């Protein structure tokens, strides 16, 4: 079997591999992931590794220092800094959703939401992108 015989077999694999690259899939599957570069102190646990890991209307995107399921119908604008490790996880953070400034608050919980960041500086960089 020469090169011409192998080509029809290889073309579908080449095309599928190209579509699965993040840059190509984003254009096909809807809105692209936010392109916000931030320097984080601690690696975060990924919520997802591929789009099917996320609930309907959400997309698996690199966000802050891990991969998160993001809902593009919402604006991500809440920040936090970790106060205590592990259990119970109490966080301090702020919101700019209404006032468009970061204000501190303390909350506890095991998972929180996608609107959280390790420092106020990271929050401000991220939130500035959306306002």
From Swiss-Prot:
Instruction: List residues of the WAP domain.
Output: 26-73
Q: What is this protein called?
A: WAP four-disulfide core domain protein 6
Instruction: Read off the lineage from the record.
Output: Eukaryota, Metazoa, Chordata, Craniata, Vertebrata
Q: Which SUPFAM superfamilies match?
A: BPTI-like, Elafin-like
Gene3D superfamilies reported in the protein's UniProt record:
Elafin-like, Pancreatic trypsin inhibitor Kunitz domain
A GO term for molecular function? serine-type endopeptidase inhibitor activity
- The residues forming a coiled coil are none
What cystine pairs are annotated?
A: 33-61, 48-60, 54-69, 79-127, 102-123
